[in-house]
Amino acid sequence: MTRQWLHLTTSPLLLLLLLITISSLTGGAVAKSDGPKIALKEVEVVPEQPFYFENTDTVLFLSAATGEVYRSFDGGLEWHVIGKGEGEEGLTNDAVVILPHKYDNKKAYILGRHGAHWVTTDQGRTWRRFEVPAAPSMLLYERLRFHGEDSRKVIFMGERCSLVACLETAFYTLDDFETVAPLRDTARGCFWAVGTPAFAESTTEYAKEIGDRVLCIVHGLKNPFAAAYRLVYSDSFFKDNEDGIEANLNAGRPVAGIINAAARTKYIMVAAKSQGTDELAMFVTDDAITWHRAEFGNHKIEEGAYTVLGGTNYSIQVDVKNTDRSESMGVLFTSNSNGTYFTRNIEHTNRNMEGYVDFEDIIGVQGIVLVNVVDNWEEVEKKFDADKKVISKISFDDGRTFQPLKANDKDLHVHSVTDFQNIGRVFSSPAPGIVLGVGNTGSHLKSYTKDGNLYVSDDAGVTWRLALEKPHKYEIGNKGAVIVAIKDDGDPTGKIQFSINHGKDWDTAELDHKIIPFYLTTTPDSTSLKFLLVGFSEESRKWSIFAIDFEGLHERECKESDFEEWPARLDEKGEPDCLMGHKQYYRRRKSDADCFITETMFKTPTPEFKACKCTAEDFECDYNFVRSEDRTKCVPATPLKAPEGACKSEDDTFKGPSGWRLIPGNACIRDGGEELDKEIDRPCKDVLKAPPGDAKAISSTVNYIEAEMFKSFYYLERAGSSRGEDETIVMLTSNGKLYVTHNHGKTWTHELTDVKFEEIVRNPYLNDRAFFLTNGKKQFYTINRAETFESFTAPAEKNPDPGMTLGFHEIYKDWMIWTGPSDCSHGNCPKDSYFTKHRGDGWEILLRAVINCEFMAQESRGEESNNLIFCNQHEAEEVDGQRMLVTSNDFFDTSKTPLPRIIAFAKASEFIIIAKPDPEKEHAMKFDVSVDGVTFADAEYSVNLEVSMELGYTLLQSTTHSVFMHVTLNDQRDHQYGLLIKSNSNGTSYVLSLSDVNRSNDGYVDFEKLQGLEGVVIANVVSNTKDVEKGSEKKLRTMITHNDGAQWTLIPPPVKDSEGKGYNCGSDGKPTDKCALHLHGYTERRDSRNTFASASAIGLSFGVGNVGESLVSKADASTFFSRDGGISWKEVKKGSHFWEYGDQGSVLVLVAEGKPTREVFFSTDEGDTWEVYQFSEKEVTVLDFSTVPSDTSKNFLIWAREAGSDKLVTINLDFSGLRDRTCHLDEDTGESEDYYIWEPKHPLQEGNCLFGHVEQYHRKNPKSHCWNDWSEAHVHSISHNCSCTFQDYECDYNYERQTDGSCALVPGLPKPNAIEYCKENPDAVEYWEPTGYRRIPITTCTGGKNLDQWISHPCPGHQEEYERKHGVSGAVIFFAIIIPIAIAVAAGYWVYTHWDGKFGQIRLGEGGGQSFITSRGDSPFITIPVVIIAGTVAAVKVLPLLFMSLWRSASGYVHLPGSRGPRPYATRGAFASRRGDYTNVVDDEDELLGDDEFEDEEGDEERS
C-alpha cells in the first residue's frame, strides 16, 4: 500500500487551517499528522563528515573545501558556521576533520590545519580552543587516541614536516586539552593500553599498573625503515625512560618490524613483518602485560591482506586474504577468548583491493553474522581478472555454520561493505531485529543500480521480503518504528518513502525538488524521529540538506501492550537459541502498533538474558592447547609437565588438564551441564624424554645424489614473522635436476622430474619464492618454499647471461621484469624487456634492444619511486648502437633519457651508480650518482685517477651511507689490483681509502664487511706491486679498518698457535710488516656466501690464513677465530676449514676443507673449547658447508663427494639434542644468567665509543646450556653520543692519509674550491675552508674534536646575515683576549717555579687522534704545562697577530670547538627516531650527520 503525502512545508496556510480545525475537535490533544515535516537548507559546499551527538538533535558537518564546520541544534532545520562564539576564535576556514569522542557522547574535537584545535564537552554548544605545536597526522587514520576509562585522557597524533620529510610525533593530555604535553616522536603512532571501555572493565585488577600505560610504535635503534620498527611502552609518559621499555611480544622477547596496532573490545592486536617475507605475525594481549602470538593454523596472514572486522567480549573476528593473485577473497576466522587461537569460519569471503570485507554482525544481537562469499572461487584463483559471482550467507551461531538468505523461498544476495552506498552501518542498527539491504534474488549478486531492490527483515535475517523495487538508501529511527528510504539508482528523485510497520507498507512524501541522494542518516543509536538527507540538485547546482521530522506522525505514546518480547536468535527448530550460556530477548514495539516511543526515545534498547545449561559449545581450548584437526579435542601446543614425583616410568599416569576451559564471560548453568574442563588422566610417556647430552645427542643423516656435480643451491628460509618450522633448500644439479628438502637435507625429493632446468633465481625481497628457469618459454616457480609449483609462459627466451633474466619489485610482490632474446637464431641477438603485474600472466613490452631493465622502487625513495624503471637501452634499438639510460614512471608510455651515453648502471643500497664514457678522455669512464632516481650528479675523485673502460671497476657493498668502489690499475691476468675509493654520504665525492687492493680475474675483490658490525672491513692488498708489474706473483697482506675505511692497519697476530707454540716472526701481539695475521679473502671462496662473520652472531668471526709477512697457500694455512669484532684473533685449528654459525653463534662448527674427513669440530662456548663429532663411517671430501643464511638453525649441511667412489652426498648434522631449554632474557635489564651485554669498540678508542655512540648487544653466556631460539637481532640499546675523536674523521676530497695518520693535500692537486658550496646552495649563509678532514657519514659524535670546520666565510650576498649570525658584544671580545693571556701567564709562572726544567718532546699519536707528550722528567704535571708555556711564548712573540686572530674568533670568523650547534641526538630515543631520507641531498659536503646505519646483510658485490 503506497500513499502520496502532501509536502506540508510548501502550503503553510493550509497547514495552519488544518491544525486549528484538529485542535478544536480534539480539545487541545496532540494531533496525528499525515506525513513528516521536511525543511530544506541549500549550501554551496559539500556537507562532509556528518556527525550527530548521541541522544540529541545536534548535528555537525564539515566543508573540506572551505575548512568550515556547520552546526544545527534542531536536527538540521537551522544551520550556522561555528567560529563566532567564545572559544571558537580562528575556527573559520581552518578545520580539517571532526572527530567525536569514541566513548563519551558529550565530547567532540575539531582539528585545524595550523596547530589550533577545538574541543566541546557539552555536545557542541560551546567550544574551547587549544593548541598543539603540530598539524594532525596525514599518515595515521586515528589522529586522536582515546582512553577507555577516563575520557579526559587523549593522545594527539601529529606531524612536523620539513622540505625533506615529515616526522610523526605524539602529544597527550590528562584534562581534556586544558594542558598538553609532548609524548614522543614515533613511527606509526601511540595509543593507550586501556584503549576501550571493555578493556578497562576486563583489567580492573591491573588498573593501577596500566592505567597510564602508553604504547608507541617507534623507529629501530639502528635502522630507520619499517623492518626495524619496535613497540615500546611507558607508565610515566616516557619521563623516567626516554626510549621506553620494549614490549615482549613473542615468548617473552621483543619483536622487530611492527607495522600496525589496533584495540578491539578487550584486546590489543599488533602486527609485525620481517624482511624477506610478506607474512605477518599477529600478537594479542588482553591485559597489556602478557602477549601471545595469534595462531591461524596453516593459514598465513600477509601485509595489507588481513582485516580486523570487530569482535565481542569473548572473541575477535579477522578476515585473512586467501588468494595470492587477487586481493578479492579471504577466509573468516574467529578467535578464542584470549585472542590467540583462531578458528576458520568460512572461506572465500568477498574483499576489495582496499581490504574492505563483505562482513557485518547484526548489531545488538549476539552471534548473527552476514557475509558475502565468492561462489566461483576456483575460476577467480586461476584468472586474476575473472568476474566474481558473489552470494550472501548468514550465520546464527557465531560463525560456526552458515546458510543462504531467503526471500519467499528464493536465495537472496545483498550488496555489502565493498559496495555500500551510504554512511554508517550497512544492514542493521540498534533497532532490535530490523535489517535492510539492497540486492536481488537468483544465483548470485548482480548490478546495484540495474538489478538491485530493497529488502527488509524484522527477525534479524531469518526471513526477508521485498520492501521497494529499485535500489534505495535507507535509515531506521525510533528503535525500528520508522524506516526511511530514497531511491538510489543514479537518477534524480523528488520523493522519499517511509514505513511505520517494519517495512510491510510504505508511504511517500514529496521533496521541494529533485536531487541525487548523497547520504541519509540519523542519530547513531537509531532512537530519534529526525533524519538528515543530503543530495545534489542538478537544477540549482547546490547541495540540498533536508531535515525530516516524524514526531507528529502518531498522536500517542506506546503503552506496555504495544510491546512484545522478541527472541533475538532462533535455532533450526524456530526456538530461542543459546549462545555464551544464555538466550537473548528484546522488548520491542510491535510492527502494527500506531504509536511512537517517546518517553525513552533516546535510550538505546537493552537486551534481557536467560541462562542455559552448559554444552560443549560453551567451552574452548585452554592456554597452551590447540584444537585437533577434526576440531573435537584440545591437544597440547607445548610439552606438558607432570607434577613433581608423579611420573616414575612411562607406564604411569598423572592428573592433568583436559585442555578445555569454560569461555570467560560465559553464563551457562554448570549444574547438570557439560564439564569438559575437569582434569583427566594423562600418560607419563607424553612428558618423559631422554635428557640432553654431549656429542651423543648430535645426529647425522647421509643422502646420495645422482649427478656429477652440485650446480647451485639456495635456502628458502622463513623470516622472523613467518610461521613454520621447515628449513627448505632447493638444489640444482649439473644434469638439470631439481631437488627439494624441507628438513635441511635429511630427505630430498626430485621435483618436476620431466623438466631440465638451467638456473634458479630467488626473489631477493621474498624468501618464500624461487623461479626455476628452462631453455624454453615455459617457466616454473614456487611462492611457498617449494610446497607447490606453478608455471607461466615467458614472453621471450631466457637471457644467456646468468642472473639477468628476471627482475623483481621491492614493494609489489607480483611485479616482474623479464629480459631476454626473442626467437634468437644467431649469437648477437637483441634482448627485449617485458613486465607483468601478475607474476607471469599478461606480459607487456617495456623496451626493445636493451641490456637490462630494473625496478628502482625503494622505501628510502618514497612512493614516488614505486613505478620508476631504469633501462640500459641501445640507441635506435640497434644492437650495435650506443647505450643510453632511459627512465620511466609509467611503464614507458612516456620516458626520459637523462644520460644519453652510458656503460652500465647498478644499485648499491640507497645509491644508483651509472658508469659512462668520459667525454674528455678516450677509453676512460666517469660515474654519475643518484639517490632519488631523478636527480643525477657527477662523481668526483680526489686523486689523479683515470678509470679505464678496459680495466674496469667493481662496485662493492654499500651499507653505511657511502659507496665503496674498486678501480682497477692492473688488469693483467692473475696480476690484478687497484684502488679502493670511498664516497661521501650522497655518493658524489670519492677519496682514496686503501691502495693496491687485490682483485680476481672475474672482477671480484678481496673486500668484506664484517656483518652485523658498523664500519669493520677486511681487505687484502698486494704488497709487491712493482714486482707484479714485471710479472711476479702477487704477495697479499690483510688489512682491517674499524672506522669504515678512514684508517687501515694490519691485523694483530696471536701470540701463540693452537698448540701453545709461539710464531717464528716473534711478534708480541702487535702487527708489524714482518709479523701479522693474513686471511684468505672473498676472491678465493668456492661459495661467496661463506663470509667471515654472521649478522646474528655479533662480534664472532672466522678466517683461514697464517701469521707472517704475507699470505701463504691454503694448504699451509690454519683456522683463526675472533670474538671481539676482529680486534684480536686466536688460532683454533691447524689446517683450512669451512665454518658455520648455529643458533646465532651458540654453536660453532668446523669441517676440514680440501682433504678427506669423517668428523667435524664444534664449540658451544664461543670457541674456548672444541669437541669432535664423527658423522660418517666413510670419509668424504667436503665441497661446501652450509646452514640457513640467518645462522639461527641447529642443523647444518655438508655437501661432499665420497672418497674413493666420487658419489655426491649431502650430510645433515642435527645439534638440536644438545640442549633442552630456551634461554631466558630480561630485556629490561639486558642481562640474566643466560645472557651478558657485549659492546663493540675501536681498538684505538676508549669507552667503547664507535662512530660516536655506544652500542650494546645481547650475547649468550657461553656457560649456559640453552638455545637462543631467536630470529631477531640482539640489539639491546644504543646509548649516549660520544665526543668526536680523530677516528670520527676521514680524509676530505683531494686529500690522502699520511704515514703518521694525518691527512694532507695530494701533491699536484689544488685545494677544493669551497665557495662552490654557495653556488650549489643559494640559501647558504656561509662556507668553510677545507681542513683536509670530513666526518665519516655514519658517525653521530658531538662536541670533542672538530676537524672539519675551522674557518668560515660569508657566502656572496649573505654578508649581513653572516654578521648577524656571528656577531658578539665588546665584553665577549675583551674576555676572549684577556682571560686566556692571564691564565697562560699564571700557569707559566707556576710551572717555572715548580718544575725541574727538563723539556719533553711532542709527537702526533694514534690513539683517539690526540697529541701525546713524553718527557724524560719526573714531574707529574709536565703534560699540561708544556702546552701552556708554548702558548704563552707564542702569545708574546706574535701578540699583534694574536689580537687579530682573537678578534676574528670572537666575531665568528674562527669556528670555536664545541660550538657545532645542538646535539643531533640528545637521547637514545632521538637517535632511534631519526629518519634516513636522503632524497634531497645535493652534490656537496652535507654529510647528514648522525643518520642510522641500515645494514643490508645480503648486499653482494656488483661487478662490471
Swiss-Prot record:
Record localization: Golgi apparatus, trans-Golgi network membrane; Prevacuolar compartment membrane
The keyword Protein transport belongs to this UniProt entry's keyword annotation: yes
InterPro entries on file: Sortilin_C (IPR031777), Sortilin_N (IPR031778), VPS10 (IPR006581), VPS10-sortilin (IPR050310), WD40/YVTN_repeat-like_dom_sf (IPR015943)
Keyword Glycoprotein attributed: yes
Signal sequence bounds: 1-31
Gene3D superfamilies xref list: 2.10.70.80, 3.30.60.270, YVTN repeat-like/Quinoprotein amine dehydrogenase
Gene Ontology biological process: Golgi to endosome transport; Golgi to vacuole transport; protein targeting to vacuole
Region (Disordered): 1485-1504
Keyword entries, A-Z: Glycoprotein, Golgi apparatus, Membrane, Protein transport, Receptor, Repeat, Signal, Transmembrane, Transmembrane helix, Transport
Cytoplasmic side: 1392-1423
Gene Ontology CC annotation, any one: Golgi apparatus
Topology feature Lumenal, residues: 32-1370, 1445-1504
BNR repeats (start-end): 70-80, 118-128, 394-403, 455-465, 739-749, 1120-1130, 1161-1171
Coiled-coil regions listed: none
Chain ranges passing through the membrane: 1371-1391, 1424-1444
Pfam families, per database record: Sortilin-Vps10, Sortilin_C
Function: Functions as a sorting receptor in the Golgi compartment required for the intracellular sorting and delivery of soluble vacuolar proteins, like carboxypeptidase Y (CPY) and proteinase A. Executes multiple rounds of sorting by cycling between the late Golgi and a prevacuolar endosome-like compartment.
Family according to the record: Belongs to the VPS10-related sortilin family.
The name this protein goes by in its record: Vacuolar protein sorting/targeting protein 10
Phylogenetic classification of the source organism: Eukaryota, Fungi, Dikarya, Ascomycota, Pezizomycotina
